[in-house]
């Protein structure tokens, strides 16, 4: 595939070609749906589908009506999430090639310029560097603009097809696959995302969407921090820069280490304050940029009173039940693995329900699982299980 294997040694036997192949990373043009809602168009079904990021119907033009105020509520503060297998690259000097270009608006030269700007957003604040190579050369990342039916999307269970204009904009694959696909039905531009009344179409910011998908290609899932570029609704919010949330995600995935030997000297000279952008990329450890995030998914949890240890054979299906006897008190269940929040199900790894969690025992799923039942800020119950796989 033109890229090196990057799985942890203990996970290499458990993770096959389909392990999370297609990143659960499609980015939808929620701003289009938001505007149509603002104009009073009947988009409730499309809005719900887009939030779930599956089977969103195509959204066409609508008859303008008297604008209504569109309000959005944020119920809780969130943060980054990583893949359950911690999929990552084993090197920082990544290459990419562009296999096809958009047919609407942007020329190949403009497309290359936009992609380079998106890659710079990551290289400016991380140890990664990105270099374009010729299409016939092997590369780590492979970028293309494709129609609805592209590559193996019709036969693959983990790679879905595009849905036409104003739906899913792009999707990416986790390491070490390196694929980044853009919907060629969209109208890509280098400016801000906006609706063109002259053309009657949405013009979508290529740099913004590409930067989001690059984050997935580096191993980050959708962030739950509202101000993060990796947020599912990043297009709607219009964030144009990486947040501290993405940096913490990279630190957690790749380690937080100084990249050059003069970091300690630079830190003593005050560079951590006056050259913060440079020091975040080169010297995060010396400048104490590795500290833990200040925005927990929920309020700080209390330590479980008891952790049950289970030694199970590989391949066994295990189910944990949490707080079934107290759910009638209208408590909400939060699941964690090794103190990381679990927000989604992952086919072949774990199935997340309201009050239960099922996993397939393997090297990837080893760890400590915790559930916390809360009602508002009050902890109603806490349970914890430590899973070890028997060879």
UniProtKB/Swiss-Prot annotation:
Could you tell me the membrane topology recorded for this protein? Single-pass type II membrane protein
Tissue-level expression reads:
Expressed at relatively high level in heart, lung and spleen. Not detected in brain, liver, skeletal muscle, kidney and testis.
Q: Which residues lie on this side of the membrane: Cytoplasmic?
A: 1-18
What cofactors does this protein use? Zn(2+)
Specify the enzyme's EC class, one word. hydrolase
Domain ShKT stretches: 256-290
Q: Which SUPFAM superfamilies does its entry note?
A: Immunoglobulin, Metalloproteases ('zincins'), catalytic domain
Residues that, per the record, bind Zn(2+) = 212, 216, 222
Q: What is its main location?
A: endoplasmic reticulum
Positions of the propeptide segment: 1-79
Q: GO terms for biological process? A: proteolysis
- Give compartment(s): Endoplasmic reticulum membrane; Membrane
Pull the Lumenal topological domain ranges from the record: 40-391
Q: What are the annotated glycosylation sites?
A: 93, 149, 233, 317
* UniProt site positions, description: Cleavage: 79-80
Give me the segments passing through the membrane: 19-39
| PANTHER family xref list | MATRIX METALLOPROTEINASE (PTHR10201), MATRIX METALLOPROTEINASE-23 (PTHR10201:SF7)
Note on domains (UniProt): The ShKT domain associates with, and blocks several potassium channels in the nanomolar to low micromolar range. The relative affinity is Kv1.6 > Kv1.3 > Kv1.1 = Kv3.2 > Kv1.4.
**Descriptive protein name:** Matrix metalloproteinase-23
State the organism named in the record.
Answer: Mus musculus
Encoding gene per record: Mmp23
